[in-house]
Amino acid sequence: MDMGDSAAVTTFFEQAVSHLGGLDILVNNVGSAGPTAPVEEVGLDEWNACMAVNLTSTFLCIQAAVPHLRAAGGGSIVSMSSAAGKFGFPLRSPYASAKWAIVGLTRTIALELGRDHIRCNCIQPGPVEGERISRVIQAKAAAEGRSDNSVRDQMAAMTTLRRFVPPTDISALILFLCSDYGASINGQSLSVDSGMEGYGPATDD
């Protein structure tokens, strides 16, 4: 499904609600790394494509979900931002911009939807173990003329725990935010990043 197609997203939610009997939780977890290049070399098509996947899809899913969440008497929305949406990320301007925007979107809709008992939060993961971070490492290494291992070691060294995040740490926080234990948490951006202190400079002088 094209997550940037408003009509397709709306139809998907209508079908899902019909099949499941309602909707009380939305987790926006679609994303794309986008191009790895200096800002002056990023094409407009690349910028728009990255925004469509990372930001517009989140907006459209929220827009489609809200009527169903209201009908249910409330619920929880959790969107995936990134540590890049907190520190920035050299050579990844479209991705970082989209992830910063998700924080702003989350805080705005939390203000709008709180009266409907719909809580809206986002998670800002650091490097999460898995195939996706491996592709990010490979792209960054190629752009900087370095080995994959050196990039991986550098990224791990930027965390106080000196390790990447297990995927189960992300899912555990989602479960918490969507449960009654998270009932008073709204409009927040929560970091799960092994104590990340920043992505650092793009290159060493």
What are these regions, as identified by a protein language model?
Residues 114, 119, 185-187:
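Short, small/polar-rich loop/turn modules that mediate ligand/substrate recognition or access, typified
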Residues 122, 145-185, 192-194:
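C-terminal helical subdomain
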Residues 37-39, 43-48, 155:
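Substrate-binding pocket helix/loop in short-chain dehydrogenase/reductase
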Residues 62, 98, 106:
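Active-site helix of classical SDR
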Residues 82:
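Residue(s) in the substrate-gating loop at a strand-loop-helix junction
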Residues 33-36, 87, 175, 186-205:
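Short C-terminal tail/terminal secondary-structure segment
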Residues 1-12, 44, 168:
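The beta1-alpha1 cofactor-binding region of Rossmann-like NAD(H)/NADP(H)-dependent oxidoreductases
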